[in-house]
Amino acid sequence: AAFSPIKTPVKSMGGLIGGESRKLYEFQFQGKSLCGNVLGLSITYAMATLETNASMGLIVASPTAGSAGIVPGLILALQEVYGFSDEKIRQVLFNAGAIGYLAMRNATVAGAVGGCQAEVGIASAMAASAAMELFDGTPLQCTYAASTVLMNMLGLVCDPVGSLVEYPCQNRNAAGVSNALIAAEMAMAGITQFIPLDEMIDTMYTVGRKLPAELRETALGGCAATPSACEKCHLCS
């Protein structure tokens, strides 16, 4: 899912995305990247996964289809750059899954319930925690990274253009993987958070329930309600 669209670009079912990951991948080798290898590849693979999803390809919801690029995007990039074994990658995916379980058990990962902060936010927290374990971070550091992620994405709305999981979802996956890398870097450097992960998950859920329906996957607000978006989707007239 993270590699196929790079090799063979394909247009999404809704026609809103397609080919972005190929452009990013080629850009990495032009010597002009602002992000460097890890982040550049992370956003490339994250966006590619969303292209696969939007063109009816096979993906793993992690934790949702709309946020499915973030965990593999970061983990695959780290493996490629640092040479982690497949066994090590499998191991840290359990870590990511544990963070996702905590969110599903105590809050939500659905954009229709909690906004994009619940989808991309939790996926980003999962990726950050897994990245910490890859680099031998402690369990507490994993939670610091995940907590930082949720602070940074608190209040993010779910506003898919045309009710499709394409745009701005693909861009949000790039932002989510970037956020995960930032949070993991901070935690690895020894930066702590006095608001624990459990409380951040709770407050994310509280904020999500306070979002109006227009900003929770209904495509009635945010980016989806802009004139340009309505013109693209032909559903608002």
Give, region by region, the residue ranges found by the protein language model.
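Generic N-terminal targeting/processing segments that precede catalytic cores or assembly contacts
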Residues: 1-57, 80, 190, 197-237
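Acidic-glycine-rich active-site phosphate/pyrophosphate-binding loop
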Residues: 36-53, 88-107, 152-160
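Long alpha-helical, hydrophobic tracts
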Residues: 52, 82-85, 114, 118, ...
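Active-site-adjacent structural elements in folded domains
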Residues: 56-61, 109-115, 164-167
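Conserved phosphate/anionic-ligand binding catalytic regions in large, soluble enzymes, centered on
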Residues: 56-74, 116-123
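Alpha-helical support elements that line or immediately flank enzyme active sites
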Residues: 72-84, 128-136
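N-terminal glycine-/lysine-enriched basic segments
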Residues: 78, 104, 108-117, 123-124, ...
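Functionally critical mobile loop/hinge segments
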Residues: 124, 129-237
